[in-house]
């Protein structure tokens, strides 16, 4: 489900979520599913032997399956604001709470945007430690198996296979063409990919290349927002705070990564949550805002197949 579908929204919380979606576009594409604060996830690591083809009256192939489970604990993200009594008591002079309500609305909008930006960043760069959720770049690091950290029921070798080191600077036509070949191959590794995640710098270069090759397009996402596409796959452009431009290839420190994702509640990439967007308003808002208003999102990353995600790292501009 999308974040607006999984959240319990009122008129005011729906308005705040709309602002979050405008500022943090990854929320428009990410899939969320309801799950417990501590839940077991089962990655699809089933193994089968032989063939399903059989002769008439012959026994069907039988494979005994043992699930590989992993516990996913939700990371807790939340902020709250309070308005000092000195502001509240202005109503004694004006006789109307309208000014205070406008001030409160502005602060709530700012708070929603701040929360959304931090969560969007951590969807990519969350370390899975120090109270942060696990982000895509920490789940699949730019490293061989020895440099990976096993997570979500996958082995370090499986995680390493989800990364491809491009090792190209996209400043010549030859390098750009070679990169596009790599990108097409990687798209083939992620069946039904529905998002290409890039930072603003690589996004601009990718569109330049795509237009030259006739692979650029445009569509409208489920929120009615126009989005550019590469070979019909939406390009989600994120800030460098989410996908850095200072990754290293061992020599240069101006590299970045691209992520091909199949967002799906089952057998894809999604985010567990038991809250969606959880908003608690000021008490007695219609009289005048007082006390504390709070916004929270409880979530964490879930990946269920190795073909749901591909990282292309060591890309220079």
Task: Name each model-derived stretch.
Residues 1-251, 255-257, 262-317:
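Flexible, glycine/threonine- and acidic-rich loop/arm segments that mediate assembly and lattice contacts
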């Amino acid at each position: 489900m999308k974040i607006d579908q999984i959240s319990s929204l009122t008129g005011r919380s729906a308005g705040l979520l709309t602002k979050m979606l405008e500022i943090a576009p990854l929320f428009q594409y990410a899939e969320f599913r309801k799950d417990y604060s501590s839940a077991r996830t089962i990655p699809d690591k089933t193994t089968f032997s032989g063939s399903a083809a059989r002769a008439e009256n012959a026994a069907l192939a039988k494979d005994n399956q043992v699930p590989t489970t992993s516990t996913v604990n939700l990371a807790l993200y939340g902020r709250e604001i309070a308005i000092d009594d000195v502001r509240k008591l202005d109503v004694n002079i004006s006789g109307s709470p309208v000014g205070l309500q406008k001030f409160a609305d502005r602060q709530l909008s700012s708070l929603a945007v701040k929360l959304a930006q931090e969560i969007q960043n951590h969807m990519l760069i969350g370390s899975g430690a120090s109270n942060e959720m696990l982000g895509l770049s920490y789940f699949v690091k730019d490293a061989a198996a020895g440099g990976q950290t096993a997570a979500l029921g996958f082995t370090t070798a499986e995680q390493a296979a989800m990364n491809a080191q491009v090792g190209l600077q996209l400043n010549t036509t030859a390098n750009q063409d070679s990169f596009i070949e790599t990108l097409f191959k990687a798209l083939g590794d992620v069946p039904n990919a529905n998002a290409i995640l890039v930072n603003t710098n690589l996004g601009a270069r990718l569109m330049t290349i795509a237009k030259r090759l006739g692979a650029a397009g445009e569509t409208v996402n489920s929120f009615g927002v126009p989005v550019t596409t590469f070979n019909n796959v939406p390009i989600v452009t994120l800030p460098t705070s989410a996908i850095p431009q200072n990754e290293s290839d061992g020599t240069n420190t101006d590299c970045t990564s691209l992520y091909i994702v199949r967002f799906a509640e089952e057998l894809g990439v999604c985010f567990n949550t038991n809250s969606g967007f959880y908003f608690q308003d000021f008490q007695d808002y219609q009289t005048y805002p007082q006390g504390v208003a709070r916004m929270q999102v409880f979530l964490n990353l879930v990946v269920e197949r190795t073909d749901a995600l591909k990282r292309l790292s060591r890309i220079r501009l």
